């Protein structure tokens, strides 16, 4: 019995050391993730400085994720769904920050205002759901074309159902017509 006590104590000490080492690794990984998100936030703000100053783009650092919000007019022609030349330039400024992501996913979210889709487009987009989905998907395609791994990309459509401003004013509707690019942990 006396032999078992020292062996048990050695085992407990080893297990405690392993647990502490695993905790330390997790803390290092979390700190690296925070540093990565901070660096990405700073880079996005620098790359998009003109667009941020003109109130067309907003970069937010939220808990465990980053969000780049772009009003539609910077990406798409009036009433359009295909990324225009200026939109391609803006996405080229965003793409370098999205390369080489490890353990992250990129959600491209499309939103509209509550104005019904114009009659001329209703055969293609019966509702704002389809319009917001097409816009988000086109942004995903452009990011992929710029080298972003397709396995990290996803498109989401919200239509008119998540406004951030009142749809009663032109300025509110402008803010509601937007694309969000969200960078978050894969397991979220």
Question: How should these model regions be labeled?
Answer:
Residues 25-30, 35-69:
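Post-signal-peptide N-terminal segment of Sec-exported extracytoplasmic proteins
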Residues 14-17:
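C-terminal motif of bacterial Sec signal peptides marking the signal peptidase cleavage site
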Residues 53-55, 62-66, 70-72, 79, ...:
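Envelope-exposed proteins and targeting segments
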Residues 56, 62-75, 106, 110-121, ...:
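Short, charged, surface-exposed interaction patches
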Residues 19-22:
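Bacterial signal peptide processing site
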Residues 45-54, 68, 79-110, 114, ...:
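Periplasmic peptidoglycan-binding/anchoring modules of Gram-negative envelope and division proteins
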Residues 80-81, 85, 111-188:
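Periplasmic OmpA-like peptidoglycan-binding domain that tethers envelope proteins to the cell wall
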Residues 1-7:
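Bacterial N-terminal signal peptides that target proteins for export
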């Amino acid at each position: 019995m006396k032999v078992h006590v020292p062996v048990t104590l050695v085992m407990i000490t080893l297990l405690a050391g392993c647990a502490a080492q695993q905790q330390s690794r997790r803390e290092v990984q979390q700190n690296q993730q925070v540093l990565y998100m901070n660096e990405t936030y700073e880079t996005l703000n620098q790359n998009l400085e003109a667009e941020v100053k003109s109130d067309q783009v907003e970069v937010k650092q939220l808990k465990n994720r980053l969000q780049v919000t772009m009003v539609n007019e910077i990406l798409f022609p009036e009433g359009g769904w295909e990324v225009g030349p200026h939109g391609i330039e803006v996405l080229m400024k965003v793409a370098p920050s999205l390369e080489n992501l490890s353990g992250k996913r990129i959600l491209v979210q499309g939103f509209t205002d509550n104005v019904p889709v114009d009659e001329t487009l209703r055969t293609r987009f019966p509702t704002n759901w389809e319009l917001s989905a097409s816009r988000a998907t086109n942004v995903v395609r452009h990011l992929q074309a710029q080298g972003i791994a397709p396995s990290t990309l996803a498109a989401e459509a919200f239509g008119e159902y998540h406004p951030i401003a009142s749809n009663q004013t032109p300025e509110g509707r402008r803010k509601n017509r937007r694309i969000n690019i969200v960078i978050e942990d894969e397991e979220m």
